[in-house]
Amino acid sequence: MRIHDLDPENRPRERFLSSGPSALSSAELLALVLRSGTRHLNIVDTCQRIIAENGLERLASMTLGELQKTPGIGQAKAMQIVAIFELNNRLHHTRNTNRRVQGAKDVFEYMSGRIPDETQEHLFVLHLNTKNQVTKCVRVTVGTLNASLIHPREVFKSAIRESAHAIILVHNHPSGDTEPSNADRQVTTLLKQASAVIQIDLLDHVIIGKTSWFSFRESNLLG
């Protein structure tokens, strides 16, 4: 069935105009953006399928090639989907500019959407000013943390150049389990000692999962 074959009151566009975007399902909202389907698939059915198979969270990180594996999604529609989520990421980043950090929860929320490939570990350094506002986010390494491979010079280089007052380390655990490993503890100890020498305070090391986080400071493990 094509969208035009639906009763007018059941069409996504008409319902959007009469009741607002909150009245539509995620598939219907996506269908409004993509607009048209194929001869054999209407766009709402196509959007329902892609969301049912992947969920919004995975959909937000899918590549053009992955999206095009869904029947009815060609290159142009795949680009539209990627563009929607990229705009959302940029809005999130804009809202978090100069965000004041008062605890690990703030760090978790700030980092939401900033990790490009959550199947790998990424180590980030957040620069803070004297008001504990984040002034910069720098990715230092990609891959499992290892104290023998991470040199304090690389971690603090940008912070020194930017005259940061303090830093916070952030890295993700792809498994979702935020419990620190022995390597995480060793890296934290190494960088805390270096921060005392460099005189740029290491305020915290936060490990983030999909829905939770672990704070070395809040767990009294920062030293």
Curated annotation (Swiss-Prot):
Binding-site residues, Zn(2+): 171, 173, 184
GO molecular function: metal ion binding; metallopeptidase activity
UniProt-listed InterPro entries: MPN, RadC_JAB, RuvA_2-like, UPF0758, UPF0758_CS, UPF0758_N
UniProt GO BP: proteolysis
Gene3D superfamilies hit by this protein: Cytidine Deaminase, domain 2 (3.40.140.10)
Motif JAMM motif, residue numbers: 171-184
Residues annotated as domain MPN: 100-222
Keywords linked to the UniProt accession: Hydrolase, Metal-binding, Metalloprotease, Protease, Zinc
Disulphide bonds in the chain: none
Family to which the UniProt record says this protein belongs: Belongs to the UPF0758 family.
Name this protein carries in UniProt: UPF0758 protein Plut_0598
